[in-house]
């Protein structure tokens, strides 16, 4: 993944800008304006979310690609915002448990090899009462659309590392987080999800049956 995004970094904003206009509309604004306190953005990329965060948050950003982070650092300097940026893997976050009030991930889980492990890590670093905000393209619940996604998925995974059939709500639920908002747009392809970490762990179906 690092090699793909390092190579993509110089023209990433041009490509993703077209996709965003077609699919995601004001999704970044929706995600970032909900952030409070100490905030971790996972896969911050070139920093496209930076203009949308409230200026009173303490923002930390990680990304697997150093080249993408270079672009994010340049934008942060242009915005005169001291963002703490570092190279990091979403599947193994280098932060203590319960160290963030908000975790934000936009167009992220679609490109991570193990999205469930990434969500597990996001839940781990959230403080009790903290919020997880996700924006991504996902497996559509509409059968004809999903059939097309199934056809395209192997090609996109192979050449771009981009997965079309992810279901982040299931991964979030399995980590004991409480989903407060789940909305689908654009034929079910785009999902906006907001969840919180309860003060006490929520028993999932598996744990209730004594399997974990």
What are these model-derived regions, one by one?
Residues 91-103:
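A short acidic, Gly/Pro-enriched loop at the edge of an enzyme's catalytic core
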Residues 15-18, 133-192:
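C-terminal alpha-helical "lid/dimerization" subdomain adjacent to the S-adenosyl-L-methionine
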Residues 102-114:
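A short SAM/SAH-binding and catalytic strip from SAM-dependent methyltransferases
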Residues 116-128:
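A short glycine-rich, Lys/Arg-flanked "PGG" loop and its adjoining helix->strand segment in the class I
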Residues 1-11:
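N-terminal, positively charged/glycine-rich alpha-helical extensions of SAM-dependent methyltransferases
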Residues 38-92:
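Class I SAM-dependent methyltransferase SAM/SAH-binding core
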Residues 18-38, 48, 52:
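Conserved alpha-helix/loop element of class I SAM-dependent methyltransferases that forms part
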Residues 64-66, 114, 137:
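Short beta->alpha hinge that forms the Motif I/post-I loop of the SAM-binding pocket
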């Amino acid at each position: 993944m690092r090699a793909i995004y390092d190579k993509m970094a110089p023209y990433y904003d041009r490509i993703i800008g077209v996709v965003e206009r077609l699919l995601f509309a004001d999704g970044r604004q929706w995600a970032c304006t909900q952030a409070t306190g100490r905030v971790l953005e996972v896969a911050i990329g070139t920093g496209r979310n930076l203009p949308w965060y409230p200026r009173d948050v303490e923002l930390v950003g990680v990304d697997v690609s150093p080249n993408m982070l270079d672009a994010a650092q340049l934008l942060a300097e242009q915005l005169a915002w001291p963002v703490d940026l570092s190279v990091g893997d979403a599947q193994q976050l280098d932060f203590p448990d319960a160290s963030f009030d908000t975790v934000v991930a936009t167009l992220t889980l679609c490109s991570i090899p193990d999205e469930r492990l990434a969500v597990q890590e996001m839940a781990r670093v959230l403080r009790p009462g903290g919020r997880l905000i996700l924006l991504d393209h996902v497996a559509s619940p509409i059968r004809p659309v999903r059939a097309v996604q199934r056809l395209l998925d192997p090609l996109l995974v192979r050449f771009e590392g981009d997965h079309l059939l992810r279901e982040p709500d299931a991964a979030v639920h399995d980590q004991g987080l409480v989903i407060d908002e789940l909305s689908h747009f654009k034929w079910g392809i785009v999902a906006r999800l907001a969840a919180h970490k309860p003060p006490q762990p929520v028993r999932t179906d598996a744990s209730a049956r004594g399997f974990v």
